[in-house]
Amino acid sequence: MSRRRYSVFLDLLRQARIDVGMTQADVARKLGVPQSYVSKCESGTRRMDVTEVHAWLDAVDRDRVTFMLTLGHALDAQGLQTFPPSRF
């Protein structure tokens, strides 16, 4: 995933936390990790794998499918195709 695409993903992930009124420390407690882990994930310093994203979305009580659809729409709106045609 390109930096621009990953940045859109991180913005949505961060916004999901903020929308439910949770701090980074709140998410960290739910995940059983240090607050610094949440900070590094949100800043893009630490990339997340799919299982970590699922756990994060569960922690902030977000539906996974809805989140992914929202991500796709956000990428499309910014002209960042989800799957570049040249790759398929």
Model-derived regions, located:
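A short, Lys/Arg-rich alpha-helix, primarily the initiator
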Residues: 1-19
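Residue-level signal for the short linker/turn that defines the boundary of a DNA-recognition helix
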Residues: 11, 21-22, 48-51
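Residues within the helices of the helix-turn-helix
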Residues: 14, 25, 54
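Residues in the recognition helix of alpha-helical DNA-binding motifs
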Residues: 16, 30, 41, 70
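Alpha-helical residues within the helix-turn-helix
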Residues: 18, 29, 58
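Short alpha-helical DNA-recognition segment
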Residues: 21-40
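DNA major-groove recognition helix of helix-turn-helix/homeodomain DNA-binding modules
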Residues: 51-69
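Short, charged recognition helix plus adjacent turn
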Residues: 66-88
